[in-house]
Amino acid sequence: MAGIDYTERIPNNVALHENRRLQRALEDWQPKFLEWWHDMGPNGFQAKDVYLRTAVSVDAQGWAKFGYVKMPDYRWGIFLAEPEAGRQVNFGDHKGQPAWQEVPGEYRGTLRRLIVTQGDTEPASVEQQRHLGRTCPSLYDLRNLFQVNVEEGRPLWAMVYLRVAHFGRDGREESEALLQRRSGDSDKPRILGAFNEQTPDWLSYFMFCFFTDRDGKYQLASLAESGFDPLSRTCRFMLTEEAHHLFVGETGIMRIVQRACELMREHKTDDVRKYGGIDLPTIQRYLNFHCSVSLDLFGSEISTNAANFYTTGLKGRFEETKKQDDHQLKAATYQVAELDGDGIVMREEPALVSLNERLRDDYVADCARGVARWNEVIRKHGIDFELTLPHRGFHRAIGVFAEARVSPDGRVISQAEWDARRGEWLPTEQDKAYVQSLMHAVTEPGKFASWIAPPARGINGQPIEFAYVRLG
């Protein structure tokens, strides 16, 4: 088991005390991070005791302990997965060479951009969600929100460590800039579009955890294949934490769907709004929105940047080492959806420039498995309704579909039809106002808002009625 040294000012398992220059630089950044957390972290709950898990090891088994912590006292630190003896670069032009412990000079700029972009997403989601605690549907959900928030703070530390340790002054300056950008700010926005969207309510939050955090899973898994070993080890541990965030999203939506179905059965109506529920068509519209903006996070379908990341050994495919090919792809092709007049066709493209689309395909297949579990809840209640993922061309702002109008079922349509039917497919102002009207805090242990069912079980073996956050 790889233990973490909590006697240090910055908890870590990288022997930080052996590099005084690096230690001083990170200790200089620490109060700036804490100032950002106080300013932009969860609003109104900084002094409350929250039942949180804290990493005590980087092993997959028994890696965390649970206990009450005030969020500003959470021990954020630098945790890398254990090194793999004899690890090699597993793809690209450097396949078979020993994995790099230092940044290759010729790839310095490219790798820095990758780390900057990934690191920018972590604080952005905290900023997007900072007001949600005031409208929590239960203490159970409030605790899960705060767990996600503090665990978005820790990968931020990991990316800052990589920048400062391996990129010198540039890395230090970028770490400062990271705390100056703000989600949705007109002057200093976050880098990626989805992280500038508002998260004003808990339906949006659960959709964000399911769709947008799942993009994070696939990006981290691709970076975990990197030939740059410190980045690989960082991302491998981050994936351990990411699983809970996806669980929060999937089970959150499932519980909203379950409650809608219960109200439909109880009152023999599809209109559950009059009974304080969120109707299934509204859930579908929110699903369409969050899925489409998350699909944009994978980038353009055809991308020379993605090809360069791969050939240089910096960013692989999802589960790269499990794939049965030459791991260089120079003669390989891959099917990509493209516009062809008024239709959409599949065309063979060089596999190297199609890597964004391949990762998007892996992501969509994973999303579909979660949606199938939601539909199973609907079927068990005997209700004739099915939630569906929209076509990948729907409501896109990046890539080949950015200039097109595509319906959720994959038809290329006119602007007039889009304008006429947009309210069927995406949340309307009335939808948003209704969902917002439901957002009232429920803080009695074991009680839940009218629009969401209780979970199947509590956290870490605790009962559902456990005081997950002490508000007194």
Whereabouts are the PLM-identified features?
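Short, well-structured alpha-helical interface segments that form or flank functional binding sites
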Residues: A124, F211, D215, D229-H244, ...
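Long, hydrophobic, well-ordered secondary-structure blocks that form the structural core
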Residues: L132-D187, M238-I256
